[in-house]
UniProtKB/Swiss-Prot annotation:
Placement of TECPR repeats on the sequence: 23-59, 233-271, 280-320, 336-371, 966-1000, 1187-1223, 1232-1269, 1278-1322
UniProt family annotation: Belongs to the TECPR1 family.
Bilayer-spanning residue ranges: none
Annotated keywords: Lectin, Peroxisome biogenesis, Repeat
Function, as annotated: Involved in peroxisome biogenesis.
Domain of life: Eukaryota
CDD domains: GLECT
Protein name stated in the entry: Tectonin beta-propeller repeat-containing protein
Residue ranges with Low complexity bias: 396-415
Cellular component GO terms held in the UniProt record: bounding membrane of organelle; cytoplasm; intracellular membrane-bounded organelle
Signal sequence bounds: none
């Protein structure tokens, strides 16, 4: 499951965090500042320091916060001067925003604070709607409020170009001071702060709400806070009722605000919506008991829960609070009444999913409220959280440990052992150190060393005079260098900047080259031993902080697990907690982290104990002796394995037919072989079974087939209709797949688990698949795998003959067709034996290719292609050899030597050599035939005439993969996209863009425990349902739900073809649950007005946010979110959300890898949720998860990425442009820069895949394109060749014409729009586009990965 963090502050003011994937507390690096109050949301901490000022801490971001600043330069054409800087009085500003309403001079655009740095200089954006512009970047139009184009025309009277520059938040993983209210911070300090608002209904993504309370009891709201603006803009005072002085405040995920007054009462802020985050007014809420002595001292707000603590240390729960409706309903905001809880509590914190954490009043320990669910929001009892603690040497708590330990030593590597063993190790005697405030450290003039023996700290004035060079970016240092710098920085000084700032910030003016010595930005001033922000003068004030380049990346903790400085201790001493913040943690009440098991030295298990080794050795020797016994089969079996039958009522559907009632029956017969582990394959080979579909009365059999014929069992449920599909290609035509519908989800899952289990046993496929397996996902998110090792076992493989497939022709008559899935590459041989009938006039053997398809404006032309035509003609006493291209025969070759005769048997061998076919008849060379058509384009064998076939053998140097006979085994989990490297590194991306790593297991929820491994983890995914509301305008009543007969449905999907409604939208299974109500989606592409409407001239047109005079239709999108709970052999990749990923084993790594170690490095790239590029370091066979992300900037937000075997990286931008990364090498794995690859006019791509078989891309019209003329000197190729999407040409149909996804490795595989798995055949260096598709089963597939398949 994903990892989340629980934060807490100790009585010393130190901040600790506890991960859901860990069982130990870790301390955030101590920088000399203590904290009195902390609050958290994912990746953001706000706190009140010991100086009563507000601080913000941004952590866990793999992608830095990077904002793009834009300024449009406008010019107008004048009759004499031409295009000039002189504008009309009614025109927009010379430098303006996109709409011209705001002046945006490049010399006036400043950094928001010292926590930001410029990332590059001003430069031109040379792109317009996916099309490149000229070098000067001008866009032309008739007038300013008009549509711009890249080309100048005779009526272009205005032009503009866009200047862009990026700024980056440089204070990651460090505390940054927020500007105080007054120039003197001590005039009105802060006493409380709260953050929330992550789930304000319909608010833009990344919205945050921050409230604070000053020492004067005033409520302050921080405007402009978001995930891209961690500090916000300014403090805004929010009036409170007369006589109300606030003491404490809390903000929920939906923006609901509760505040505690000094008199013990609480007030609630109402009217908090996406358009008004501050809210409208305050409402008073009575205390739990109307008694003068009972006062509320603390309150915490969740989504649908509010908890408070009174002055008698009792906890209370508020009933009736509904966070989603709190902004529009006062009753939902204030609730209905109080419920008293048992416990002695001093403070409470409610998480976003209403889980509750608290601190005890007497023992100051941390507790969790167990059993909190939506049905029981108050929970059951308080559970003590007991976890080991990592504390700093500077903590006074270390003195307790040192006195307990008796002065023994500790090593940095000791924490890598189990916590049970840690406590038994002797620890180094601790030294109690007093923590000096920052003011004291800064004024120190002595050369005292830090506690870890580092160099003397710099003086205050010396620190301000450090080099003004820009700090190294994230991509400029490797991980080891960055870690050394971070460690050295910790040794060098015991304090850090609370408001990191750039040394010299460049602000461009005029010609974009002038530098101000000190730009206007947030500059720290010393106050009460801390560092707080104030507005600095750009010229007079000096740059007072060196840029903090040692803290970046996603690590919340300095150095993560490696504590080489020895500054951290692991201990079990009791910490007195003063504050807990659960806003960033999400835990499942039914699957809690391992936080509650007390670790003691008595519970440790020594796996290397002598007694344990002795027992294991004896068991192994006994097993070896049993394996050598020859008479094991004569012993009577302890348990007699017999067959079993499982039956149930269901509904059966033939393809294209209706569902009808039936009885299904599964019969399993076990071989019951011995228990010898060495003969497990033989024992399972005897397993068998049958599946039968009977009539409702059981009298007639509708269909019956052996379980060995099943190639795939998958769920194909629809809303309210639980179904499974059984694929068995050996069934009669139009009988596969067999679809069965059940009465409930539980019954469907029961049959799915049994069928999957027995099919895996019959095919001897359990556990981890081979590294070169093909992975695939279905529309429902199920993960399947094809293991070629299983198919290899069924093909005779001899060193001299390669792989052999024997085709069953016992019941076949001519004309005979059979697919040759590997074509006829060099070394392939086709052997045909049979008998010619006495009355035969002629016989025919053809090696056929896919028909050449040409799409004309009003028709589709198919042209036959035959690579080899062997035609013995007995009536003419000759044999004809020929080829056909584009339905026309070429020059034929006649051979009067007759090797075939009527009434005689024959043996024909066609062997593909380097440049010709060698034809052998009756073991004698008959002739050869030079290639006229590429032999690799051959797809099938055709035999006709009066002939009886005996055998057909197909020999090939490579594995013969029959598309219809590929067995797809379900692996478990819920994944949308899958990526396989070929060396046991498999990644996946779920619907909510969470990255997952395959851990080598098998099983999950779909198997119900019948099979599988122990590496199963819970998985949670979220999905959003959309419904479109459509309206048409009429002159009388305006926009109404009344439509024309030719219009789309008034409630529909995005295309308007499918009727949808909010009332009839149902969940797919019982594992899904709604987590929101229907709401208007204001973040729809193209924008929307205040009511969520989009306008257009007519329905199949482009939509925009504001109504125009010619707009006659409008629509708006409604959304509702659901959560799916599943399980599978996957673990979370990282905290960062990713849109796409690419895994590739580079050719240079294969050459240098050691086959004995089998630890091959993998190039791993990904696209972050904001469109930036990430490269994952440390990914290899033994470490599939890798170590850390490194960020690579991009001017355009990207959506797709792929890596080739030579290391080349290709990406697709959100606007459809394609980019190529050049400069990548072993010494420079990140490359140098992006180079645009121009696409044909009007074409926008959405996905790309690179492999040994070429560079393939998928555009927005679901067409596939292949890059032509690729060479070593020109690796990006010259142009794109598009494959035609012809209706009714397989795999296309009239309604589904195109492809969903494509994957390129040594072969090219794709998923068609109708869910069929396809493999491209006939790909050669001369023809990289291939000639046609070989089709597999129609499993409603979604995504396939063949990058690792060889």
């Amino acid at each position: 499951m994903p990892s989340f963090y629980l934060f807490a502050a100790s009585s010393e003011g130190r901040v600790y965090t506890l991960s859901t994937n860990s069982g130990a507390w870790r301390e955030l690096p101590y920088l000399g500042l203590e904290f009195k109050k902390i609050c958290a949301v994912p990746n953001f901490l706000w706190a009140i320091g010991g100086d009563r000022q507000v601080y913000v801490h941004v952590h866990g971001l793999d992608v830095p916060i990077r904002i793009r600043e834009e300024s449009y330069e406008n010019e107008r054409w004048l009759p004499i001067e031409g295009f000039s800087k002189t504008l009309l009085p009614t025109d927009r500003y010379r430098y303006s925003s996109a709409d011209g309403s705001v002046e945006r001079g490049v010399d006036k655009i400043r950094l928001p604070s010292m926590a930001w740095q410029w990332d590059g200089d001003w430069h031109l954006d040379l792109e317009l709607d996916g099309q490149p512009l000229t070098e000067d970047g001008w866009m032309y139009a008739l007038d300013f409020p008009a549509t711009y184009s890249a080309k100048k025309s005779w009526n272009s009277y205005v032009r503009r170009r866009k200047w862009v520059r990026y700024r980056r938040y440089a204070a990651l993983n460090s505390w940054c001071a927020v500007a105080p209210l007054h120039k003197d911070p001590t005039q009105e300090p802060f006493i409380d702060v709260a953050i929330g608002g992550t789930c304000v209904p319909n608010a833009p993504a990344g919205t945050l709400c921050v409230w604070a309370i000053t020492a004067h009891g005033r409520a302050m709201f921080r405007t402009g806070v978001s995930k891209t603006a961690p500090e916000g803009l300014r403090w805004t005072a929010v009036p409170t009722p007369t006589g109300s002085e606030l003491a404490q405040i809390s903000v929920g995920p939906t923006g609901l605000v509760w505040a505690v007054l000094h008199n013990g009462r609480v007030i609630v802020r109402t009217g908090v919506t996406r358009d008004n985050l501050v809210g409208d007014s305050w409402l008073d809420v009575k205390t739990p008991v109307a008694a003068s002595s009972l006062r509320i001292v603390h309150v915490s707000v969740g989504t649908d829960a509010v908890w408070c603590v009174t002055n008698d240390h009792h906890a209370w729960f508020r009933r009736g609070v509904k966070g989603e409706a709190a902004g529009i309903s006062e009753d939902s905001a204030i609730g209905k009444g109080w419920v008293e809880m048992v416990g002695n509590i001093s403070m409470v914190s409610v998480a976003a999913n209403d889980q509750v954490f608290a601190i005890g009043a007497a023992d100051r320990c941390l507790y969790h409220r167990s059993g909190v669910t939506s049905a029981d929001p108050t929970g059951k009892k308080w559970r003590l959280i007991q976890c080991p603690m990592q504390i700093s040497r500077t903590s006074s708590s270390l003195s307790i440990v040192s006195r307990k330990s008796g002065g023994s030593s500790s090593t940095p590597g000791s924490k890598h052992q189990s916590f049970s063993n840690l406590y038994s190790k002797e620890k180094e005697k601790g030294v109690v150190e007093t923590c000096a405030v920052i003011e004291t450290v800064l004024n120190s003039s002595t050369g005292s060393c830090s506690s870890n023996g580092g160099p003397p700290g710099l003086l205050k004035n010396e620190r301000w005079k450090l080099s003004a060079d820009s700090p190294p970016t994230i991509g400029s240092l490797n991980l080891n260098d960055r870690h050394k710098q971070r460690t050295a920085a910790l040794r060098e000084t015991s304090h850090a900047s609370s408001a990191p700032a750039a040394d010299v910030v460049e602000v461009v003016t005029g010609k974009f080259e002038t530098q101000l010595r000190n730009p206007r930005a947030w500059s720290p001033v010393r106050s009460v031993g801390s560092v707080v922000g104030t507005e600095a003068h750009p010229e007079s004030d000096s740059t007072v902080f060196e840029s903090d380049s040692t803290h970046h990346g996603s690590d919340v903790f300095l150095g993560e697990d490696d504590d080489h400085t020895g500054s951290q201790f692991w201990t079990e001493c009791g910490i007195l907690w003063s504050c807990v913040a659960s806003g960033a943690v999400t835990v499942d009440a039914s699957n809690m982290p391992n936080w509650f098991n007390e670790q003691t030295s008595d519970s440790k298990v020594d796996v290397n104990a002598n007694w344990r080794k002795d027992i294991v050795n004896k068991l192994q020797r006994r097993q070896e002796k049993l394996a050598k016994l020859q008479t094991v089969a004569k012993f009577e079996k302890a348990v007699e394995l017999s067959s079993w039958v499982k039956s149930a009522d269901a509904r059966y559907q033939r393809p294209g037919g209706e569902f009808e009632d039936c009885i299904i029956e599964l019969e399993w017969v076990s071989s019951g072989s011995g228990t010898d582990t060495n003969s497990s394959e033989n024992s399972r080979s005897g397993d068998s079974g049958t599946f039968t579909v009977l009539s409702p009365d059981g009298a007639a059999t509708k269909i019956q087939f052996p379980l060995s014929d099943i190639t795939c069992v998958q769920c194909c449920s629809e809303a309210g209709a639980p179904r499974i599909a059984i694929h068995a290609p050996h069934l009669p035509v139009n009988c596969s797949p067999v679809k069965l519908q059940f009465s409930s989800d539980s019954e469907m899952e029961d049959w799915l688990s049994h069928l999957s289990s027995v099919c895996s046993q019959i095919n001897t496929m359990v556990g981890k698949p081979a590294g070169n397996a093909i992975w695939i996902t279905s529309e429902l998110g199920d993960v399947f795998v094809f293991d070629p090792a299983n198919m290899k076992a069924h093909q005779t493989s001899e060193p001299s003959e390669g792989y052999v497939e024997k085709m069953d022709v016992s019941t076949c008559e001519t004309p005979y067709y059979n697919t040759l899935y590997n074509g006829m590459p060099c070394g392939t041989e086709l052997e045909i034996s049979g008998c010619v009938y006495d009355d035969a006039d002629q016989i025919r053997f053809d090696l056929q290719s896919h028909s050449a398809v040409k799409v004309q404006p009003h028709r589709v032309e198919k042209h036959r292609v035959i690579a080899l035509h062997l035609n013995p003609r007995f009536n003419e006493r000759t044999t004809v050899l020929n080829s056909m291209k584009e339905s026309e025969w070429l020059d034929e070759i006649r051979n009067d030597k007759m090797a075939f005769a009527p009434g005689a048997t024959f043996s024909l061998k066609i062997r593909a050599l380097q440049d010709h076919y060698l034809i052998i008849v009756n073991n004698a060379v008959y002739t050869d035939y030079k290639y006229r058509i590429d032999p690799e384009s051959v797809t099938r064998l055709y035999v006709s005439g009066r002939i009886k076939l005996f055998n057909v053998l197909y020999r090939c140097p490579s594995l013969i993969v029959s598309m219809e006979r590929m067995h797809w085994r379900q692996m478990g989990g819920h994944i949308k996209r899958i990526f396989n490297s070929g060396v046991d590194v498999v990644w996946g991306i779920s619907c909510d863009n969470t990255g997952w790593v395959y851990n080598g297991g098998w099983g999950g929820m779909f198997l119900k425990g019948l099979e599988g491994s122990g590496k199963i983890n819970p998985m949670i995914d979220t999905h959003t349902y959309y419904v479109y509301e459509n309206q048409r305008w009429n002159p009388i009543s305006g926009f109404t739900a009344k439509s024309l007969p030719t219009d789309r449905h008034m409630w529909s999907d995005a295309t308007g073809r499918q009727k949808r409604s909010k009332e009839h939208t149902k969940l797919l299974s019982t594992h899904c649950e709604w987590i929101s109500d229907w709401a208007i989606d204001y973040n729809i592409p193209g924008g929307a007005d205040k009511e969520g409407w989009q306008y257009a001239i007519d329905f199949p047109a482009n939509y925009h946010a504001h109504k125009k005079l010619t707009d006659c239709v409008r629509r708006r999108r409604w959304m509702k979110r659901c959560r799916l709970s599943s399980s599978g052999p996957w673990q979370e990749l990282s905290q960062s959300k990713i849109l796409d990923a690419a895994l590739q084993v580079l050719d240079e790594d294969v050459d240098h890898s050691c086959s004995g170690e089998r630890n091959t490095a993998v190039a791993a790239w990904a696209i972050a949720s904001n469109g930036d590029v990430l490269i994952r370091h440390g990914v290899c066979s033994l470490n599939p998860r890798g170590d850390a992300w490194e960020h690579i900037t991009s001017d355009q937000p990207l959506v797709g990425i792929s890596v080739g075997p030579t290391g080349q990286v290709w990406t697709v931008a959100r606007n459809g442009m394609v980019f190529f990364r050049y400069g990548i090498s072993r010494q420079n794995p990140c490359g140098d820069a992006w180079q645009q690859v121009e696409a044909p006019a009007g074409v926008t791509f959405k996905a790309i895949s690179v492999g040994r078989a070429g560079i393939w891309a998928l555009d927005n019209q679901q067409r596939l394109a292949v890059r032509k003329e690729i060479s070593r000197t020109f690796p990006e190729g010259s142009h794109w060749q598009f494959l035609p999407n012809a209706a009714n040409v397989p795999p296309h149909t009239d309604q589904h014409c195109g492809f969903r996804s494509v994957s390129v490795g040594s072969e090219v595989w794709a998923i068609s729009l109708n869910g069929i798995i396809c493999r491209r055949c006939g790909i050669t260096e001369e023809n990289p586009a291939g000639v046609g598709w070989n089709l597999g089963i129609a499993g409603q597939w979604q995504n396939v990965s063949v990058e690792g398949y060889m």
